[in-house]
Amino acid sequence: GNKARDYVDRYFSMNFTDKHLSMNNFKIDDESITMGDKRCKVYSLVDVDCINVPSLVRPFTSIEVNNVSMPVDMVSLLDSIPSAEVVVYNQMLFIPNQKKELSLLEKKKNRHASMPNPSNQIAVEDIKNVQDVIARENKQLVYTHFNLIVGVPIDTDIQRCTNHLENLFSKLGIHISKQSYNQLELFVNSFPGNCYSTNPEYDRFLTLSDAAACLMYKERIQHSEETPLKIYYTDRQGVPVAIDISGKAVSYTHLT
């Protein structure tokens, strides 16, 4: 109860660090939300009117560390947004009735096939590929919505954050939406437990569950394992982390 209330209050004020927090009036325009000494902007990851995402996605990408290629989470770039005081990455998945969605997908394919031109033929092929994957591998269709809330000091140019995100996501083949003019609606719909308020026609897009999982944030801080037999490796930042190689690092009593 109290923890949930505190979390919602902190989300409302975009303040997850200070011990004491205060609420401020909101000033909202098409580009951002101003609250006290902070300005926030909500970035919708996908524009449903013009979906610019790669046809194939992986759960990770690679970076170079000391001339060595290392895998990182696909959206690990969220850790490096310039001037950002707070970053919230909302990941929403809605599981619809599968038979109904497959029926709608078949109707959509037939509609595209009835108008033979290059763009419609590409759409038909894409739908066929999805249907083949679902039939062969028993995959699940989901509706998803991803958005970023970036908070910066009020005297900071938030366009720097926008340029940074557009540049980094473009390297992954994703062009974030430029039509996020409904800032207040996106902010309110992103509240914990309020995701069902997102507009089904405008804010959600249909994809396979595997592809949606690839866009979820999977990074976490690596901690040393509890074991008396410590073998130290370093993480990507060069911080030593103790790794147990016995496979029994549950409690000390399990080790002999």
Model-derived features: positions:
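Extended, folded cores of ATP/NTP-driven motor/assembly subunits in large transport
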Residues: G1-Y217
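Short glycine/proline-enriched loop/turn "hinge" motifs that connect secondary-structure elements
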Residues: R136-L141, Y233-D235, I245-K248
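Generic "edge-of-domain/loop-turn" microfeature
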Residues: D155, K248-V250
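Core alpha/beta catalytic barrel or barrel-like domain that forms the active/cofactor pocket
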Residues: Q179-L186, V239-G247
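N-terminal pre-Walker A segment at the start of P-loop NTPase domains
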Residues: I221-I243
